[in-house]
Amino acid sequence: MLLCRRARARRPERSLSEGLDDLVARIRACRICRDEPEGAPLPHEPRPVVVPSQRARILIAGQAPGLRVHETGLPFNDRSGDRLREWLDVTRDEFYDPALFAIVPMGFCFPGYDARGSDLPPRRECAPAWRGQLMAAMPQVSLMLTIGQYAQAWHLGDWREASLTATVANWRAIFESGEHPRQLPLPHPSWRNTGWLKRNPWFEAELLPVLRAEIRMRMAAEE
């Protein structure tokens, strides 16, 4: 143990960035959901899709990759991503710039489909194994977008309401709570939620303008 402490003392130049790179390499090699699963193992080869960043001030905390993201290795590379970028009012190039956005879903691998053909929930093994380490490695993040019930359950704590609608409707109190990083809860941008958006017009009328202003403010700080 003493030897380890001395080794660290001789390497003060080791940066948080190097530590994050090591962490990402271990995540890319992770097979816990296949080899040590909680319940049924992942039915296909794991392919973790996660884009942490040592510079980005905005963290997108989503659910888990869909099939197309699993195939391409690019997060939100689907219709849900198109809608999310529309909400944020950013281009694809801006969205995929790691100096601007970190993208860290609750589950890093495509979880597969249920009997109805819908995506399964994020794997239960993933967040306990990796999320705390990733968050600690990104202290510069000042705005977190918690997308969907799984990210909100993990990150919002007592601020999470009984339903996603109630949680998102309470966005202003959550945003102004003084927590760090500041959080804005969002529904999943899936096109299956088009009906939800129509039933809740306040989301586009009230929340999105604040979201876009906060995004632009942080992006401008990187210019």
Question: Where are the predicted features?
Answer:
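Short intrinsically disordered terminal tails
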Residues: 221-223
